[in-house]
């Protein structure tokens, strides 16, 4: 039984799920919006929101914590210098998920996840 087991497996093992989350979070924070499946977008949202909330601390420790999840120094710099100050007064809810239809090949629901 799955009582109390939050999160989705996405047909991947734990290291592949972590790699997927990091890669998509990096892309989202670099570009501002990405298109992915609805399920992946729903998994990505809390991951990115925690990164932004951590970055709002603004100190060296916060930068190092963000760098643990985002392995691209340019994106870490952007998060610390541009994204976090933008949301300084906002207590959460930094992302929005919009459904954009279905994928032609397999009919899965696609979504656009973007920074508000």
Swiss-Prot record:
GO molecular function annotations of the record: structural constituent of ribosome
Pfam families, per the entry: Ribosomal_L17
Keyword Ribonucleoprotein assigned: yes
UniProt record, GO biological process: translation
Keyword Ribonucleoprotein: yes
TM ranges: none
Signal sequence interval, chain numbering: none
Alphabetized UniProt keyword annotations: Ribonucleoprotein, Ribosomal protein
InterPro entries referenced in this protein's UniProt entry, alphabetically: Ribosomal_bL17, Ribosomal_bL17_CS, Ribosomal_bL17_sf
GO cellular component: cytosolic large ribosomal subunit
Subunit description: Part of the 50S ribosomal subunit. Contacts protein L32.
Alphabetical list of NCBIfam families matching this protein: L17
Family per record: Belongs to the bacterial ribosomal protein bL17 family.
Database matches in PANTHER family: LARGE RIBOSOMAL SUBUNIT PROTEIN BL17M, RIBOSOMAL PROTEIN L17
Protein name per Swiss-Prot or TrEMBL: Large ribosomal subunit protein bL17
Organism: Deinococcus deserti (strain DSM 17065 / CIP 109153 / LMG 22923 / VCD115)
Taxonomic lineage from the root: Bacteria, Thermotogati, Deinococcota, Deinococci, Deinococcales
Gene of this entry: rplQ
